[in-house]
Amino acid sequence: MHIVSLALGGCLKAEPVRYGITEDTGGHITYIRGEMDALARRDDVTLAEIVTRRFDDPRLGAAHALEEEWVAPKLLIRRIDSGDRRYLAKEALSADREGVTRAFIADLRRRERLPDVIHAHFADAAVLARAAQAEFGIEWTYTSHSLALQKAGAADCPQLQVRIR
């Protein structure tokens, strides 16, 4: 089975991850890396692939500009290029939604073999997963990671309220 874990926000890379380097580089990255590492060790999984957004920002590390980063023999981080190579925080990702969706569909179209299932993390990735299902019939599942539940009452901060919405 070929499984894609789709997560667009934060600085997702092989270890060592610099947690906290951006406001979006936190616990969900640990979850995704752990999930996919465990799946890659299974005999019935041929490829555990993390798909994220490609960007080029020297302050955040050169790895994020790489198209592919092999973490283990069956664990790959693939970065899709929407044409906007800036790092975008969660609240700014919606401006790149069309571009990253087009890039993801184009990436899938070029493949010899499509993934069997997509696991989308957060609503922005669910948009891409729905597009892949519409185009190719790929089944998908979704994890919201409870940002709003954990942080809604934590602070009276307009930027945080935008992120939660």
Q: Which stretches of residues belong to each language-model region?
A:
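Catalytic cores of nucleotide-sugar-dependent glycosyltransferases that transfer UDP/GDP/TDP-activated
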Residues: 1-165
